[in-house]
């Protein structure tokens, strides 16, 4: 009577003589690097990894994989930068681990915040005026709900998209001159 083999045993038996090409090995190694960096950055953003520990782990990773450039880290951090979020921890890592000047990114984010605040205040003012004219509702206690205002949500989405485009152009340039 024959031996009953598991699917894993059958697959291993069929593939035991296969080897990876050098391209496949490089691709697999790059994927492993990307996943490790992604994991480190997520832990850092979640507060489970301090900045110093992240820097130490990253240096070990660079040594383990003989990495001379920081492109993978730059790309991962770039993906995480958003104009309406607190990006200081990410920008600090870009500055300290990758020696990148983040002034352009910081300027775009600051400009977004100022424009967003100003636009929201203007919209609140317009909504208060509309309430006063249409319903004769006035007073210091009147505070329109911007989240419920479709016109504001559309305006905010468009404003954010414009700043995201600016950020993306700057982020694309981060790898400029680095290979």
Language model regions located:
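N-terminal interaction modules that seed assembly of large macromolecular complexes
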Residues: 2, 15-81
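Amphipathic alpha-helical coiled-coil segments with heptad-repeat character
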Residues: 23, 27-30, 34, 51, ...
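Charged linear interaction tracts used for macromolecular binding and regulation
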Residues: 54-144
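Conserved structured catalytic cores and adjacent interaction surfaces
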Residues: 11
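Alpha-helical oligomerization segments
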Residues: 141-179
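Coiled-coil heptad-register positions
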Residues: 26, 48, 120, 124-127, ...
């Amino acid at each position: 009577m024959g031996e009953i083999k598991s699917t894993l045993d059958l697959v291993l038996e069929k593939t035991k003589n296969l080897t990876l090409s050098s391209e496949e090995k490089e691709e697999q190694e790059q994927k492993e690097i990307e996943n490790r960096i992604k994991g480190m950055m997520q832990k850092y953003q979640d507060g489970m990894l301090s900045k110093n520990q992240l820097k130490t782990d990253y240096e070990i990773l660079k040594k383990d994989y003989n990495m001379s450039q920081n492109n993978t880290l730059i790309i991962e951090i770039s993906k995480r930068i958003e104009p309406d979020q607190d990006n200081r921890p990410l920008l600090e890592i870009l500055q300290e681990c990758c020696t990148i000047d983040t002034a352009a990114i910081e300027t775009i984010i600051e400009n977004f915040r100022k424009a967003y605040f100003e636009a929201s205040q203007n919209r609140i003012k317009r909504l208060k005026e509309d309430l006063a004219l249409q319903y004769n509702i006035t007073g210091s206690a009147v505070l329109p709900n911007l989240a419920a205002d479709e016109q504001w949500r559309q305006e905010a989405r468009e404003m954010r998209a414009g700043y995201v485009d600016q950020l993306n152009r700057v982020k694309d340039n981060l790898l400029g001159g680095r290979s």
